[in-house]
């Protein structure tokens, strides 16, 4: 097949065609969901979502956007999409509108261009809405970029001070719960990114010890397949440009979880 450059595509199932969910023209490139068993999962159930308001920082990123999708399907009162990238914010807000239309949802989706390093902006947003839960997914996480001597200070400012800023805003505005998305690289860190996330974890643990009004927690993900900057998109790009496909060691073994699994 390699010699004749065959492309692999997926076509809709017979049940999807019969039920008019899809058409024969809906041919798509092969995705991770088609290969991995269990990659497609049901959205997480959120208690009392209809009366709750959520803020997701880094809402346009790989993890933040999936958290947004899963919460949105519970039809919450408000979702605030807090995102530094204009393009990513545009994409996730547009996707939310499509989901709301197809699922007949009534959530108030509020897109906010913001930076967790900007304390005044955080104060304004948190004081403007009665936020119940924060999912803090905003971070600089690309190890080689963060490791560069020109970027270390900005990475620390964003990942450490930014986390402190948004956590303080949550405390000052009586948020009920705050969940920080972290990484296994924060365990005995060997690089700058891991060190900044470890520092952030210490901040969250300390704030949780001294604040009874808000529940702080965090989750540490391992390798998330197909997230931005991970090896799968890199391999796809390398193959598309004719190679070579680069790995750190010929005997390396990695374990992955999918973005929906991690977010769920």
Model-assigned labels for residue ranges:
Residues 2-53, 171:
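Flexible, Lys/Arg-rich cytosolic regulatory linkers and terminal tails that connect or flank
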Residues 54-74:
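N-terminal Rossmann NAD(P)H-binding glycine-rich loop of SDR-like oxidoreductase domains
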Residues 71-78, 174:
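Conserved S-adenosyl-L-methionine
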Residues 76-91:
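Conserved glycine-rich Rossmann-like NAD(P)H-binding loop of the short-chain dehydrogenase/reductase
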Residues 97, 168-171, 192-264:
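NAD(P)-dependent short-chain dehydrogenase/reductase
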Residues 110-133:
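Conserved Rossmann-fold cofactor-binding substructure of NAD(P)-dependent oxidoreductases
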Residues 111, 155, 178, 216-219:
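Hydrophobic/aromatic anchor residues within beta-strands of the central parallel beta-sheet
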Residues 130, 136, 140-201, 206:
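Conserved Rossmann-fold NAD(P)-dependent oxidoreductase catalytic core, especially the SDR/UDP-sugar
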């Amino acid at each position: 097949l390699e010699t004749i450059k065959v492309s692999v595509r997926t076509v809709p199932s017979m049940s999807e065609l019969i039920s008019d969910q899809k058409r024969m023209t809906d041919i798509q490139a092969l995705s991770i969901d088609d290969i991995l068993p269990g990659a497609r999962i049901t959205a997480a159930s959120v208690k009392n979502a209809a009366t709750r308001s959520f803020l997701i920082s880094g809402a346009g990123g790989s993890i933040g956007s999936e958290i947004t999708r899963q919460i949105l399907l519970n039809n919450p009162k408000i979702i605030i999409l807090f995102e530094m990238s204009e393009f990513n914010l545009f994409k996730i807000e547009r996707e939310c509108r499509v989901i709301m239309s197809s699922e007949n949802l009534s959530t108030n989706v509020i897109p906010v261009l913001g930076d967790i390093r900007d304390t005044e902006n955080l104060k304004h947003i948190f004081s403007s809405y009665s936020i119940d839960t924060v999912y803090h997914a905003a971070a600089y996480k690309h190890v080689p970029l963060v490791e560069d001597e020109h970027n270390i200070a900005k990475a620390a400012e964003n990942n450490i001070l930014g986390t402190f800023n948004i956590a303080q805003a949550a405390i000052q505005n009586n948020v009920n719960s705050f969940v920080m998305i972290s990484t296994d690289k924060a365990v005995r860190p060997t690089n700058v990114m891991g060190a900044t996330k470890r520092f952030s974890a210490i901040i969250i643990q300390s704030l949780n010890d001294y604040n009874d009004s808000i529940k702080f927690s965090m989750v540490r993900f391992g390798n998330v397949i197909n997230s931005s900057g991970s090896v799968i998109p890199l391999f796809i790009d390398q193959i598309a440009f004719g190679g070579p496909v680069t790995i750190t060691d010929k005997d390396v073994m990695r374990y992955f979880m999918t973005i929906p699994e991690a977010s769920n």
